[in-house]
């Protein structure tokens, strides 16, 4: 089976397991009347903080239960300037997040990843999971 290799992969391959657990604390809630300092009982959450730590914090409650995930990661198009290692850096950033998302995803769940046309050919991390669907294009 083909594998994707990049500089730094060995350092991040298990990084998602090393991310510390954080407890999600409800500090306020929202409803049609605005913000409240007390919990209104809603299961919806706005999480402020590092997204890697937030994903790890969701695992105890939602592991294997999420039916639909949509992410819109940075496109890695090089608009910030050409860097010969930018693809490696992007993969090192994305891999642990995708591994945690995979743990959250239900067996019959689906993940949508928003990427641009040039990123499509480069986004092969999702291919490590065998349940692939054809790309969904929106113009």
Q: Can you annotate each of these PLM segments?
A:
Residues 1-70, 75-96:
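DnaQ-like (DEDDh/DEDDy) 3′-5′ exonuclease domain used for proofreading
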Residues 87-139:
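Conserved Class I SAM-dependent methyltransferase catalytic core
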